[in-house]
């Protein structure tokens, strides 16, 4: 691959990476637990945006259950964000980079 093509490829990859970052920033992914009593929202980068808890999920006698519900909802949302990020990164990589098969 000549240097001009390599520089062009690098520039395109940088532009595509910026667009990917914008998509990740603009996307909200949700996780829930307890039949929807606890919901967590994250952006495509995995930053926690918020947690919503219905009052029916709050039992002062069973705080551990609520803690588990929150953790489960957040983990589900984070897993969705990780899947989205990995898919977006896969789209960025050209299929024919020599010497780096199966990078993603």
Language-model features: where?
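A short interface-forming secondary-structure element
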Residues: 51-63
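Residue-level signature of catalytic and energy-coupling elements of molecular machines
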Residues: 10, 46, 70
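Long amphipathic alpha-helical segments used for membrane anchoring, targeting, substrate engagement
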Residues: 1-30, 80-104
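Small cofactor-carrier domains centered on a conserved lysine used for covalent cofactor attachment
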Residues: 25-28, 32, 37, 59
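Conserved functional loop/turn residues at catalytic and ligand-binding sites
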Residues: 28, 41, 52, 73, ...
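N-terminal intrinsically disordered, cationic/polar leader segments
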Residues: 32-52
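Stable alpha-helical structural segments in soluble proteins, enriched in small hydrophobic residues
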Residues: 69, 73-84
């Amino acid at each position: 691959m000549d240097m001009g093509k390599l520089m062009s490829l690098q520039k395109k990859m940088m532009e595509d990476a910026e667009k990917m970052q914008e998509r990740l920033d603009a996307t909200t992914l949700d996780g829930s637990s307890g039949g929807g009593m606890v919901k967590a929202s994250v952006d495509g980068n995995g930053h926690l945006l918020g947690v919503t808890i219905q009052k029916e999920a709050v039992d002062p006698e069973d705080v551990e259950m609520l803690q588990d519900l929150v953790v489960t909802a957040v983990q589900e949302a984070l897993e969705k964000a990780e899947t989205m990020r990995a898919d977006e990164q896969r789209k960025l990589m050209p299929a024919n980079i020599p010497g780096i098969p199966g990078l993603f």
